[in-house]
Amino acid sequence: MTAATSVQPSPAPRQPGLRATFNPRKEEKVFLARGAHAFTLPGRRASVNVEVDVEAESDEAALDAKETTITVSYAEKGQESSWSAAKWIKLDRLAKTSQHGVVNEDRATYQQAWSLELLDEAVEPARAIWSALYAFWIRHKRSDRLAVLLKGTQATKVRSYVFEAGLGFKSPCETDLILLDRNAFWQGAGAPAGLHWLQTPVPTRGLFPYVLDFTQSTSPPVLATHPLRPPKPAPGSVVYSRYVFSCSQHLELVHIDVSNPQHFDAYTRWQNSDRVNHGWREKGSDEKHRKYITEKNDDPHAMGVLVLWDGVPAGYGEMVWSKEDGMAAFVGGLGNYDQGTHLLIGEEQFRGKHRFTACMVSLKHACFLRDPRTEVVVGEPRYDLDIIPLLATFLPQEIRKEVELPHKRAVFFVLRRDRFLEEGILE
């Protein structure tokens, strides 16, 4: 085993190897609170309970304590008992976490290493590992990488799982340590069946093959070659599922089903409200709304989704492939796998910056997850809407320009994959 180094920990949050977090304005930083110690996993069929043996004012303070042990338990829905999955223990040891071969030694970042042990009660190793990583990353938001010493009888199994899934890699300078990568986790690497945030991949979670396709339309004006798009999940399917810690509730995106009265009634009520109509301008009869949803369902480039909090409808959003979208001709430069989003929050009880941001982040996350070739997700809200400051404040995206579209003047937002994974508020 490599001896512990005497180098002091690196405190500054912007040093190499530490996460370049996107910070809202100072008065808004309460948004980053972690929430409960118990949370539901994607799909809402299992939950995780986290016990930290240190009393502290925040998760960061607990992790900073000299000695900290984190025990992670897992339970399936409907079961009275849970089983202990894994244990994290903070080590009295520093390890290099900045990028090896890139950062000079005098600038290198050293952080406290942790041990990870899969417990004997862990009857499903893959779920235990995933739950343990989830429980840790939501609390350890400072770093892109974490140095880990694998311990216990299942250490070899954990090591193989992490390496084969791409969740981490062997430390180049300390032979007994591995380095876990935060961004790989939030891309869904190694997620067991049913626990991926993307709940309904069609036809599979693998890459859909490149097949040349063509779209021609006069209203809106479209004349574009682009990749053939994969089929969408069936209406009513859960597309995306994630527990949102700042709100202590579970968010889902469900493919809207025009034949489902709950879906249709909520959608029509929202679009016919004066507040939503100010932004979307889709007020009208049931026939008009049914036609709109049906056309979206028949359109291979767009998918409408309901936003639900703990199963209660809250809003409506859209995920579109941008290359063949109606606004592409007016903004230019969109790639084959670039995507775009639209969002409205219809229910008053689910409004506010915390929930709106969580919904928008989830839509963007779903876009990046459904095709790893997507490098950019764009948005083009009308320039005078009051959501513009929220979008600029709570998402790490850039305002590219204001652009004239046939039906509105819009602010053109561009969100890049690498920045979203590094700085997006997913914890």
UniProtKB/Swiss-Prot annotation:
Top-rank lineage group of the source organism: Eukaryota
Reported induction: Expression regulated by iron through the urbs1 transcription factor.
Keyword Acyltransferase: yes
Active site (catalytic residues): E380
GO terms, molecular function: N-acyltransferase activity
Enzyme class: transferase
Pathway connected to this protein: Siderophore biosynthesis
EC number(s) stated in the UniProt entry for this protein: 2.3.-.-
Pfam families: Acetyltransf_8
Disrupted-gene phenotype: Impairs the production of ferrichrome A but does not affect the production of ferrichrome.
Binding site for substrate: H342
Keywords from the UniProt entry: Acyltransferase, Transferase, Virulence
Region ranges (Disordered): 1-24
A biological process term (GO) from this entry: siderophore biosynthetic process
Transferase among keywords: yes
PANTHER family: LYSINE N-ACYLTRANSFERASE C17G9.06C-RELATED
Record's function text: Acyltransferase; part of the gene cluster that mediates the biosynthesis of siderophore ferrichrome A which is contributing to organismal virulence. The first step of ferrichrome A biosynthesis is performed by the HMG-CoA synthase hcs1 which catalyzes the generation of HMG-CoA and CoA using acetoacetyl-CoA and acetyl-CoA as substrates. The enoyl-CoA isomerase/hydratase fer4 then catalyzes the conversion of hcs1-produced HMG-CoA to methylglutaconyl-CoA.
Family label: Belongs to the lysine N-acyltransferase mbtK family.
Protein name: Acyltransferase fer5
Organism: Mycosarcoma maydis
This protein's encoding gene: fer5
